[in-house]
Amino acid sequence: MRKTNSIKSVELSPFPYVIVEDFLDEETLDLVIDALAGLEYSFSESDLFSYWASVKLTEIDHPALNVLREDLGDKVWRAEVAKAFQVSKLSKIDMAAYVYGLGDFLLPHDDQVENRVIAYSLHLTPDLEEEDGGSLDLFEANKAGKSKLVKRIIPKFNSLNMFEVSDTSWHQVSEILTDIQRLTLTGWYHV
C-alpha cells in the first residue's frame, strides 16, 4: 500500500518535479518486485534508447500489480498529484516496467505523447550509486532547442519521481556503467 497521501512542495527548476521517498510499504514493495521479476521483457533499441521493457502493466491482472495500479491511480492520489502540480483533473494512468543493464540508456526527450501531463518513475533498484550510471538527468531547455544538464537525480530505492510533461521537460536516463540492473516502473498521468 501507498505510505503517503500527500506530496511535499514541487521543485520548479528546471521544470516542475518532485521526489516522494519511501512510497510503498515493505510488503507491497516486495510483492511488486516479485511480480515484475516474473514478467517477460522485450529488448528495445534505437539511436535514442536501449533497454528491456515489459508489456503495459495496465493490461495484466496480478494481485500485486493491481494494488500498485490502485496506489498510483486511485482518485485520492490522482487528485493530490493534480493539486501538487497545479494541473487539471487527471483521468488515467499507464505504466510499464523497464530494466536498464550495462550500456543501456535513454537519451534526452520530453515525453510529449498522447495527452501525457505528469510522468512518473518508481525506482526499484536498491543501492544504485552515481558510479553505476542510470541517473535521471533533468535539462534546462528553451524552445529554440538549446539545453544543458542542470539536475542529476540518483534513483533512490522505493522513491517515486514525478515531473510535469511539457516542451521544455527534457530528461534522460544516463548510460548504465556497471553490471547493475536498474529496474523502474514508469508511466504517465493523462488528462
Question: Can you describe what each PLM-predicted range is?
Answer:
Residues D61, N66-E70, W77-V191:
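Catalytic core of non-heme Fe(II) oxygenases with the double-stranded beta-helix
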Residues R2-A84:
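Non-heme Fe(II)/2-oxoglutarate
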